[in-house]
Amino acid sequence: MKVLLLVMLFATSSLATAFDHDHQAFTKLLAEHVSWNSAGTESTVNYRRLIENRAPLDAYLESLSEVDTDEFDSWREADQLAFLINAYNGFTLALILDNYPIDSIRNIGRFWQNPWRIRFFWLLGSDMHLDQVEHEIIREPGRFDEPRIHFAVNCASVGCPALRDEAFVGDRLDAQLEDSTERFLRDRTRNRYNAANDRLEVSSIFRWYGEDFERDAGSLAAWLARYADLFSDDEQVRQQIRERRVSIGYLSYDWALNE
């Protein structure tokens, strides 16, 4: 009887401390502070309100920091990637709040500092900066090899793909990544076909991280061709993009704060 009781207590304790892969706390916070534009292609964050209600964010980030590498490594790949994307986005919010009010994330730090390389949080047993999460873990070749993460991680800027009003979760990760990708690509202010010069003009994200898209599809043009229908309403133009018969140019990036 005592053995059975101990087993039940252990099981109950394990369930109580199990990590929430639904990221419910983060979804609740995002739903309360993130708003979409009417087209559903851009979002803004109410940072002023978030500052006044910061405790839930700090508690959520603390729960992420408590996860060690052994626990992380035991998860399935989708849960790992969802965790990392949410960590990046959550700690980016914290970085903005720590320095608010600001006009741009690039204004954070001294003139010789890169805000993405400031070590200010603990994750997976290490003192980390944002670039580590994105470039050394998420983008590590052979690990996830998922170019759509570039439309999921949010740099708190107008030019960046939208911060969703929900957390990423492993059970729906593929659908969420695809939805975020399509929302960004169909935004004609950031990705569009320019008939005047017969050019597909896309976000600078594709210039900075072109290798990720090339690794996935063989070339950037081939990757963009998958989404030809989003860049133009003209079927002839869409076919040109599918057949990779358009040149590619890059638009300037808007680093203004996404508020």
Residue ranges and their predicted role:
Residues M1-V7:
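Sec-dependent signal peptide recognition
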Residues V7-L9, F144:
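Sterically constrained small-residue positions within well-ordered secondary structures
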Residues A11-S13:
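N-terminal signal peptide c-region/cleavage motif recognized by signal peptidases
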Residues F19-I85, N89-E259:
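Interaction/scaffold regions that mediate signaling and macromolecular assembly across diverse proteins
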